Curated annotation (Swiss-Prot):
Protein's recorded name: Eukaryotic translation initiation factor 3 subunit F-1
Keywords on record: Cytoplasm, Initiation factor, Protein biosynthesis
Family in the record: Belongs to the eIF-3 subunit F family.
Occurrences of domain MPN (ranges): 8-138
PROSITE patterns noted in UniProt: MPN
GO terms under cellular component: eukaryotic 43S preinitiation complex; eukaryotic 48S preinitiation complex; eukaryotic translation initiation factor 3 complex, eIF3m
Family matches, as HAMAP family: eIF3f
A GO molecular-function descriptor: translation initiation factor binding
Matching InterPro entries: eIF3f, EIF3F/CSN6-like_C, JAMM/MPN+_dom, MPN
Localization in the cell: Cytoplasm
Oligomer and partners: Component of the eukaryotic translation initiation factor 3 (eIF-3) complex. The eIF-3 complex interacts with pix.
Lineage of producing organism: Eukaryota, Metazoa, Ecdysozoa, Arthropoda, Hexapoda
Organism: Drosophila ananassae (Fruit fly)
Pfam families, alphabetized: JAB, MitMem_reg
């Protein structure tokens, strides 16, 4: 498959690690680089992890601690054997003169390595994210070169990462003085209530879109229509009585789990107090 047909999907933990490495950089370092880890499947490069590689850039050369990079990769393989090298990342918004030298090293580590640039300066209030592949150029018998060509890049996340991002969004507008140091887990019933409210808001948004399309206020989108049709077909067909019975059964199971968890919590607290009770 051609490198130009690749699509890069980046997980949020990668961006957090890049920002953390940039904040911890040396005072004389203007750019931070590192290795991208993940997997490649059917033209999709999924970046799930990364680590920083210490380096120094001079006018005519680049010095990188390759032994450190190999040690970090070996350690990561022991924990995540499914992750392999898929490319490298760098802070900044542009490809520099030294990028081709660094990319040449990663081309020996994997096929079609991708280069990810992360704009940590937050120009325009956003973190710019770009992905490139290196395309070889030249004529037969002449000098050859390479050109960094942009490829599509998008953000993706697993379900636990999505919950973590939602929790971060809740505290992003809170001042540090009033921000709690610890966030207790939300009760199960409260989570169901919050999820139901969000589902109701999304349903209202969909109904408004459908009404606007019927009233010719909005131009219909075939892609949205197909997604809505697939959504309707995915809903199981059942009567009102069947749905009520199933819902009540799930609520009873949830209440039973909550009761058992509270009993276990009380038992553990009682056991802790009895353990540290001074003997007579």
């Amino acid at each position: 498959m051609s490198a130009l047909n690749l699509t890069v999907r980046v997980h949020p933990v990668v961006l957090f690690q890049v920002v953390d490495a940039y904040e911890r950089r040396n005072a004389d370092s203007h750019r931070v680089i590192g290795t991208l880890l993940g997997s490649v499947d059917k033209g999709v490069v999924e970046v799930t992890n990364c680590f920083c590689v210490p380096h120094k850039e001079h006018d005519d050369q680049v010095e990188a601690e390759l032994s450190y990079a190999l040690d970090m990769y070996d350690l990561n393989r022991k924990v995540n054997p499914n992750e392999s090298v898929v490319g490298w990342w760098a802070t900044g918004n542009d490809v520099t003169n030294h990028s081709s030298v660094i990319h040449e090293y990663y081309a020996r580590e994997c096929n079609n390595p991708v280069h990810l640039t992360v704009d940590t300066s937050l120009q325009g209030g956003r973190m710019g994210l770009r992905a490139y592949v290196c395309i070889q150029l030249g004529v037969p018998g002449g000098k050859s070169g390479c050109m960094f060509t942009p490829i599509p890049v998008e953000l993706t996340s697993y379900e636990p990462e999505t919950f973590g991002l939602k929790l971060l969004q809740k505290t992003v507008g809170v001042s540090p003085a009033h921000r709690p140091k610890t966030v207790p887990p939300m009760l199960d019933l409260a989570q169901i209530s919050e999820a139901s409210q969000k589902l109701q808001q999304l349903l209202d948004l969909i109904l408004k879109y459908v009404d606007d399309v019927i009233a010719h206020k909005v131009t219909p989108d075939n892609a949205v229509g197909r997604q809505l049709l697939d959504l309707i077909h995915s809903v199981p067909h059942m009567t009102h009585e069947q749905f009520t019975q199933m819902f009540n059964a799930n609520v009873r199971n949830l209440l039973l789990v909550i009761t058992l968890s509270q009993l276990i919590k009380t038992q553990l607290q009682l056991n802790e107090k009895l353990t540290f009770l001074p003997s007579a």
